[in-house]
Regions:
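A structural signal for the main folded, soluble domain(s) of proteins
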Residues: 67-71, 100-108, 119, 123-126, ...
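Non-heme Fe(II)/2-oxoglutarate
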Residues: 11, 20-101
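Eukaryotic charged/polar low-complexity linker/IDR segments
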Residues: 146-148
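A structural signal for well-ordered alpha-helical scaffolds and beta->alpha junctions
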Residues: 12, 39, 43, 81, ...
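N- or domain-start disorder-to-order transition segments that initiate the globular core
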Residues: 1-16, 20
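Catalytic core of Fe(II)/2-oxoglutarate
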Residues: 136-143, 153-267
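Non-heme Fe(II) oxygenase catalytic core, chiefly the N-lobe of the double-stranded beta-helix
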Residues: 48-51, 76, 85-143, 152-154
Length: 267
């Protein structure tokens, strides 16, 4: 039992057993979210350590598909954040994810936090709908699970920033999750799991959308999780129907080919 966990979640294996069917059967793809998973006082301490990533030597994404900031490894983690992230990479939490998701291959954490860690989106920022890169560039493992822990207090729905999960054929959004403080979202990462935060953030100046992201991997994956080929690919972007501001220039052509192949396969 971890001191990071809230009272209702002290027995993670029981939580996983209770919700694994809901996870498996979720639409538009396997996913779930939990509220108040973590001890509020400890999460407050982690929020207090969260830096303004725009003022650090971070990864600054600013193009037609994303406007956001991301940390690089552990370098900007405070001591409490580091302990928390290490817990989310620990055996007990991996066992929880294994049971919840039903993944048969052994899940492996990412000590490098490649593409993960602290994420921040300022007013006007966004992350267009996409499927994730499917291989870890250092470990060579298959990406299987994303975990997102939101740190946004007093977040009004009018601010936007919903985490959107889209159908594989990009015909419509299947689910939306508001990024509220102490909410944890979990979803399976495949070539069919399109997701993002596609519309510009509307929160007031001085606020931002903050989250902690962790990705989990395995050595191999089921063949039915490949939509187009078994080759490694980077993040692939998808255009929403009737969304005039989803213009991806050369990046759009890559994912359009993927979508067309999916439609031909009837997936």
């Amino acid at each position: 039992m971890s001191a990071f966990l809230g009272e209702e979640y002290r027995d993670l294996q029981a939580v996983a057993a209770k919700f694994k069917d809901a996870y498996k059967n979720a639409e538009p793809f396997p996913s779930i979210y939990f509220d108040n998973v973590f001890d509020e006082e400890k999460l407050n301490e982690i929020l207090a350590e969260f830096p303004d990533l725009s003022k650090k030597d971070t990864t600054n994404y600013a193009d037609d598909v994303q406007v956001k900031f991301g940390s690089k490894g552990e370098r900007f983690f405070g001591e409490k954040t580091k302990a928390f992230m290490h817990y989310l990479n620990s055996e007990p939490f991996l066992n929880f994810l294994q049971e919840l998701t039903g993944i048969e291959e052994t899940l492996v954490n990412d000590p490098y936090f490649h593409g993960a860690g602290q994420h921040e989106i300022k007013p006007g920022g966004f992350l267009k709908i996409h499927m994730d890169f499917n291989k870890h560039k250092t470990l060579g493992l298959d990406r299987r699970i994303n975990v997102l822990v939101y740190l946004n207090k007093d977040w009004d729905e009018s601010y936007g920033g919903h985490f959107e999960l889209w159908k594989t054929d990009m015909s419509e959004c299947g689910a939306k999750i508001l990024p509220l403080f102490n909410r944890m979202a979990i979803f399976s990462t495949t070539d069919k799991s399109y997701h993002g935060h596609p519309d510009p953030l509307q929160c007031p100046e001085g606020m931002s959308r903050k989250s902690l992201a962790l990705y989990y991997y395995s050595n191999g994956r089921p063949a039915d999780e490949f939509a187009h080929s078994k080759e490694d690919h980077r993040t692939l972007w998808a255009q929403r129907p009737d969304a005039e501001n989803d213009t991806f220039t050369n990046k759009k052509s890559t994912v359009t080919k993927v979508i067309n192949r999916l439609k031909k396969l009837g997936k």
